[in-house]
Amino acid sequence: MARDYYEILGVSRDSSKEEIKRAYRRLARKYHPDVNKEPGAEDRFKEINRAYEVLSDDELRARYDRFGEAGLSGAAAAASGFQDFAGIGGFADLFESFFTNFAGGGVGYSRSRQGPVRGDDLRFDLKLEFLEAIFGGEKQIRISHLEVCPVCGGSGAKPGTDVKVCPTCGGAGQVRRATRTPFGNFTQVSICPTCGGAGRVLEEPCYNCNGEGLAQTTKKLRINIPAGVDSGTRLRVSGEGDAGRRGGPPGDLYVYLFVEPDPDFQRDGLTIFSQVRVSYLQAILGAKVLVPTVDSKAGLEEEAELTIPAGSQPGTVLTLEGKGVPRLGNPMLRGDHKITLVVEIPTRISSEERELLMRLAELHGERINKRDGFLGGLLRGLAQMPGNREREEE
């Protein structure tokens, strides 16, 4: 019974094509007949090549996952009488192959992997304090990524050893396979399973990168945080992703920002929200009070002066214009700072204060005994407190 192709390569069934390729290249180097002279190594090498040939092809892999080995031998298509079509991936591949062959002289086209390959992009999640997001700054981060191997210089070969022409494809990076169809005999070109399209094989892999040409390394980066960023903002750092292969350009680093909350301020876009507590007398008579702003908390300026209009009600919202968040990309433009008044009613008052309030209530025609009206209700609450009842009894 044939072994499972995923088991042969040592990968799971949900592995990506890149993971399958890495597993194949690692095993191919280990069991290549030019390197491994042990009995059975050649058979193992052929088994590895067959597994990679199937799992690296999306169509073949899908049929293998569904039907197993039978799906590759034509059994899955036998009911339709088209056993010969199984080798070229179904009707879609058949007609694509036919028209490509017609236009290209009888050779199906498959893109070679010998050229430069751009490195992968990377993601890094970065937490910012509330004020860092508002005013920006510089942050130092540490990332792990792939760089060109310093030992082999990216060739993948152990220093002092050669990179040889692939014996399977002769350096072309592609192999041809003749296929018989109802339209005649055609040749299909696919990526060489031995060299993975590189056209070259290693005499001996580099001990530092295991023949990949790239090595995992950690480095520090300084990231410039512009003023006005928020949670979800994405910053691109060009060229700081994984290194490219075969001289390809590196990928980019994408930094995703997450802003931590602040105990004093809330934010919605460019607007800052906070509260200020004032006494009931300040709310009634009006006042000027100092309030903290994001600028003062950051140490950029003193607290701002806020004018409380006379007769302000609890929940009144006052605005400090231009004291909000700088606009991202144009920090000279800023939002506003909205401040909600929280009017504090004292829980204890002195006898003198109570007497003054009672006189004020009488001026307004309040019936103190019944504790009607706003001030009456205030006095009733004050009078019912244990401490105030004791004062009355004295």
Curated annotation (Swiss-Prot):
SMART domains documented for this protein: DnaJ (SM00271)
GO annotations of cellular component type: cytoplasm
Keyword Zinc annotated: yes
Cofactor list: Zn(2+)
Superkingdom, natural source: Bacteria
Residues reported in the UniProt entry to bind Zn(2+) 2: C166, C169, C192, C195
GO molecular function terms attached to this record: ATP binding; heat shock protein binding; unfolded protein binding; zinc ion binding
Role of this protein: Participates actively in the response to hyperosmotic and heat shock by preventing the aggregation of stress-denatured proteins and by disaggregating proteins, also in an autonomous, DnaK-independent fashion. Unfolded proteins bind initially to DnaJ; upon interaction with the DnaJ-bound protein, DnaK hydrolyzes its bound ATP, resulting in the formation of a stable complex. GrpE releases ADP from DnaK; ATP binding to DnaK triggers the release of the substrate protein, thus completing the reaction cycle.
Description of its domains: The J domain is necessary and sufficient to stimulate DnaK ATPase activity. Zinc center 1 plays an important role in the autonomous, DnaK-independent chaperone activity of DnaJ. Zinc center 2 is essential for interaction with DnaK and for DnaJ activity.
Cited PANTHER family: CHAPERONE PROTEIN DNAJ A6, CHLOROPLASTIC, DNAJ HOMOLOG 1, MITOCHONDRIAL-RELATED
NCBIfam families: DnaJ_bact, PRK10767.1, PRK14293.1
Protein name per its UniProtKB record: Chaperone protein DnaJ
